[in-house]
């Protein structure tokens, strides 16, 4: 047994170190301290928690001596209690594990402790001086145990509930508030439900009340709207108590009470705010921490913000004074009375409004306010003169306004421009060009100055940099900005570095953000790698596979490699299989710590190894990756351990095959006995909530558990339509139809609003349009139901002040066209505009919003065509468009015909790369883009650099297979991994595969790292070559390559090869590929999907049943030491600080 359980057992049996035989037997008549005598009686009664708390209390005030153990055992013997160490240990372990997996029992036993014992338990939670137990030669580090305890679901919940129930009767209020704070801060606020205020004390003295209020303020964002309202009511109930005026003439709200309320001040009513006395609001604004508090009222509404501003105006503070403006926090986002402002104050306000992006909603109003302030700030001055003083309002400047700027103005304002967030891609392109207009070559100084504008620098400019300047950038803190560059820009930087004569000597110095772009071929040439250097690098799997093998030849300490950051991605299954039992168990923690980096195949290998080495201590979640029969072998006694372990993981990434995932979920339901009875079970289930079937959600979650379950369901991102319908049914049962909903209800249900019907959403759109629009703004880029989008569209239309157009253009007269406000609020719901309406949009509106419109995923072909026509109306023919026009189009560019694409100026690879971000091009369009670049740039295929190949993106697939062979091998090999991400036609992939043979040799020479590097290029392999591949390499095909293999080629795989695909690649096999397979091949595929062991695919029949070891003192579930440490932890009642 490991040191953990041994230490715990020694503690529990009073540290008898004599193995069960006593050296001497003291007389039970010898004096035994009453506390130890009480402890011994509790051991006899089976009250082990009470006994341990008494022991802890005794140790705090007495020196532990060796004879005390013998005295206690003598006392037990005198009571005819014949314990042996093994039997007592077994009883103790069973009891501890009962706490671990049934934290309700912990709650019950804590309720049964006497006041002195409960006091001890709370002190263990509070005081660092209780950080260890020192009992002769054994020291128990309670601080380390504290960190482990809360890994067990439900522990925090039990501690939270018992603290509310008993603490305020046993300890002083300040100590109890501190305990609550520790427990709540470790719970993500999920314990705070609206009914919690019924259990909170109503008579706290001032300091305790302030401290507890501070805890609730810290957890504000993690609590529901209903809970926020309930906590606000509890706080104000206490704050109002000493205030006896009842006629309403004087407000109960004082400056100090506003400070105590903190973010809860946004729940004050309009009337209460308007009733605050000028003296008190002035005193509040004068507090040094008032600005910090007002900076955090993210959910304040315009109405309440303007009410506060009005009261401040009535105080001694002048809101037109610069020092006052600096104190207003987020209230500046709703500043009114602009007619009295001068340019200086407008500039000050604009600077303060940088923080307005943190507001929850109302951003359209913020943008309008910034635009008005921008007009005032530039009044009687040119834009060139005021550019540096406009803060982030400059992002509201149109492309024509930016183009009108002088280069000198941009240089002068660069310290402001380089920090602004929210720039559009086209704006960055214009400003970068303006800044570099006077520079012949990009220098280190320029790069230092550009900040966020660096992303607008052309790739050719990076490629033309001096080597020394480039290395100076990469060795400076500026290297962190490399991650903000596009792939084509990153490759331009790398391409320049690799051209140097001593390029390979510097590969190890390439910063983290760029290192993952270094080619496998270039890694082969570098011999100076070590594990320390790689700790800070981000690695592709192909890089990790090569580097792990390379470094494995230079060290005999695998822990050095496994601790080297992302190098764990490269551990092959053969290495895991070859580890000795002892080494594997010693190293498993490295794998577990980096679990998110492991592939499903690696996890499957770990599961098999653990099963063979130590199935009794195997983490139960690994069973889900083994063949399904292993799940059926889990007995009821192991169910809770299985659920806890699996619930901490993401099942969708652990088990990729949907059929097998269904098997796992059925086992979960079986373990739950078809019901989630309470919130403790919700804690246990964890992320598995997202996979429970609709019928279970609708009928299997009890009303008591529903609130906690709903909190968990909020994080589910891939619920099926059936699951969504079940959630909707439960919500309607709980809250009734939307007609009955309050604002708090609607806010709390915001993550689920898209589940409701069009009629139900119509009600929400009418009652709470702002909440609906806020919800939609958080779902940008998500494919949403049409009903939801139409509801958002309706809510915006209802609040729009737009009038019918008087545009004489044919078909536009009388049409209500979109405004910038409308477009901003609608986000993805812009897909609801009629094409005719989009075509009638005002020119200025189109110019200001083209990038936002280009990002809408739901536009139809007709809508895109209308927007393209609008672009031609505004910008003239495509042949007149500049780079910033093209990059701003987004998906609108998809409407360009082949001839229109050929008219574009595509001489810059960055322009081509912006078009390449779209993946819906037809082959003809892609060919036009490719040809246009070659013609406009003057390059031939043989002249292309590696960054050109990256910049083409999916349009590279339009290259003729014969043209591919003209690409320089030195440029091709640098970007093989990037090209391997493209989904090209089979002939094109075959062409790239032929080119790859020049670099990597024929397929029979390919290694695991080469196969990973090739990606989809490997799908260009021939039938004969595929048959010749070693089956051990099959797991190293990328899943995308498996999907790209034509069915007639895929069917050439042998049954052994198919069985060796591994779970990840097997899950990537398409339906059309399956149709080509024989029954024997399909059976092999099923084995791979099920996680069968690849090297025993013929000898390990599907029907064989796994066997478990005989029951021991440490049942299967968690590693023995961990389980007992956690058990000890529960008894010691430690909590994370």
UniProtKB/Swiss-Prot annotation:
It comes from the Eukaryota. One of its GO terms (biological process) is cell-matrix adhesion. It is found in: Apical cell membrane; Secreted, Extracellular space, Extracellular matrix. Glycans are attached at residues 156, 211, 244, 289, 321, 380, 384, 530, 594, 740, 798. Residues 1095-1119 are annotated as: Disordered. May act as an adhesion molecule. Belongs to the stereocilin family. This is Otoancorin. The lineage of its organism: Eukaryota, Metazoa, Chordata, Craniata, Vertebrata.
